[in-house]
Every structure is written in C-alpha cells, then in structure tokens.
Amino acid sequence: MAYTFTTLKTAIQDYTQNSETTFVSQLSRFILNAEERILKECQLDVFRKNVTGTASTGQQYLQKPGDFLAQNSLSVINSSNKEFLLYKQVTALQDYTPNPTTTGTPKYYADWDEVTFLLAPTPDSNYTMELHYFYRPTSITESADGTSWL
C-alpha cells in the first residue's frame, strides 16, 4: 500500500490509538527519524543514482552531486569501455602523486571534502566520468504531493 504523508500519520495514530496533542504534533519528527534510520541501515536500490560529468584537463578535483551521501563507484569512460577508479585515502593519493602537476588518466580517487573528490593522477585531458552513488531522497514530510519512496 502506498502512503501519503496524511495517510501515514493517520495510520500511525490508528495503530497506536493515540490522538494526544503532543504525540500528534511530533509525528513529523517520528517519521523523519524512521526515514533516517532506514536510510542508514538499508542500502535499498531506491537510494542509488548514477550521473556522468567531466573531469577537466589539469583539474585534480571533481565536484560531487548536491544530493551525494556516499560513493558506490567512479569510472572513466573511454569510448565504450569503463575503467573503474580505486577508492583510497587522500594521503595515499598524495603519496602516489606528490606533485599535482603530474598528469595522466585518473586511476584513484578520494573524498577531499564533503563536496569534492580528489583524482590521481591529475587528468591529462577531459574525461567523461560516471559516478554511482547513494543519495538522500526527499522525505515524505517535505514532498510537494505528500508521497515519497516509502
């Protein structure tokens, strides 16, 4: 059965047989906490996305999507082949290419910060990259039509 935000709140109230004001006013928080726990505990297919982008010549950093939570894989697409990069720690990439002007086809990547990947070696030309990742879907409490992945 598909739930809207309204029908989910009603179902919770019916199940708990509780219409007390404080309980009812906290249902949104209760639902958000449940969504968050499911997101952290289960790697469901509905939490996966893939995007393509370009790693630019001489740029060792690659921007992450705005809804990014965690990577599954990153690859360079050469003609029809995909070359998967190995995920490493930043220090391993800095040991591998201590000079950021060292260029080539990227072989490794790391989380530089919350919004950026670090590539090594630095791309020697423009490469099409494909990222498979986990993202945070819109909460049923924030959805415009009151529906979501639940």
Spans of model-derived segments:
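Glycine-enriched, solvent-exposed interface loops adjoining structured elements
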Residues: 1-150
